[in-house]
Amino acid sequence: QSSNIWGDKTDTVAIGTVIVYTKQKWIDFVLEVDAYANDNDGMGIVWRFKDLKEHYRFFTMIDSGNPPNGERGPWRKLEVRLGKGAGEKLPFYKTLDTEKGKSYTQGQLTHWKIDVAGDRFTVEVDGKKALEGKDNRYKEAGYIGFTLYAQSGVFFDNLVLTDTFPVDPRVAFTTTWGKIKQQHIAK
């Protein structure tokens, strides 16, 4: 991604751009990916993404001059979008956890690992625990994707996504195959 999109003029939080994979939805998972940025602005991962107003995100930024009127970098954050609820101020996020003074290193590969299990979220950066949060606002399965803010060149590689949502054994493939065998294969 190299569009260098910031968001709306009125944004005091980094909105930028989002790209999501829409062929499948996930609830619980472990996602690992390598990220490389030519710029020092915001980037991260979104999950349980329903739309621009309902999702979670891991977001990190180096730049101390962005966003305008917002919190200065460097930092890493775990956030929940406040959604469409009555009385919610939009387009704001609620911060679940922050690691101030740390982000990524511009021009160097960074490895992220996001573990999402129910209402608990853990982020590791380069093999070290960075953020931890808990929230139950969005419980349903949603899309997973990337979010960028004012970046002029970001690359993601070596993506591994492991679905950890428990399978109902009554409808699992092996159970279903066992039932078919019982019904249709003579003893």
Please state what every model-predicted region is:
Residues I5, K9-G87:
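Secretory/extracellular carbohydrate-interaction modules
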Residues Y21-W26, N38, Y104-G107, V116, ...:
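Surface-exposed coil/turn segments at beta-strand junctions on protein surfaces, enriched
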Residues L31-V33, T105-V125:
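Short tryptophan-centered beta-strand motifs in secreted/extracellular beta-sheet-rich domains
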Residues G85-K113:
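Short, aromatic/His-centered strand-loop micro-motif at the edge of beta-sheets
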Residues D119, E124-T147:
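Short, solvent-exposed beta-strand-to-loop segments that form ligand-recognition rims
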Residues R137-A186:
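Ligand-recognition surfaces built from glycine- and aromatic
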